[in-house]
Amino acid sequence: MPQIYQCDAASIIIENQMFSFNDFKVIASKCEILRLSNVVIMNNDEIIPETEEDQFYFEAAISLETLFQALPNVKTFTYNLPKNSLNIIITKTAEELLKIPHFLSLDLFKISQIPEIFDIEGFYGHIKENKKTKIELDFSRHLSFRYKFRLRTIVAEILETESRDYKLPRIYFSRITRSAHDKMLALHYQN
């Protein structure tokens, strides 16, 4: 990739790419709208793989919270995680995201292909207090029965609550009932 020394773009869409963290910061640190799809940001010390076969070894990928810390101006954040999101989402991702001040002031936070390692319990606490950010969570198809059961319970709690003092999220996962999905979607877009 040619060297970029400055980028003042307010809106950026990146698909099917691998970047060093330094290159990513140059490209995206000033943007307000960022959409990533199948993108891996590698630790600066790692060599970016040359071939597509090498792209499935993401041990050196930086975590979502590290990535997010480099985006102080972002207001709309969408990330369709790569299929092998090893190290991008870790057990402390939800907890660490909530410590980042500009994360709490987002207009939209949408993430897809979320693996089971994501701490939905901790993030659900944030959802119930969130009054600003539209949150859309699409989970991976590869979830345990227990994790899906917890997601169903969270969705049911949200839908059964009559007086909500928070922005209703959109949560999707395989095995969500059609009626729960449709009701959540309708309420989410009314918000």
Q: PLM features: what roles do these ranges have?
A:
Residues 1-191:
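The conserved beta-strand core of Leucine-Rich Repeat
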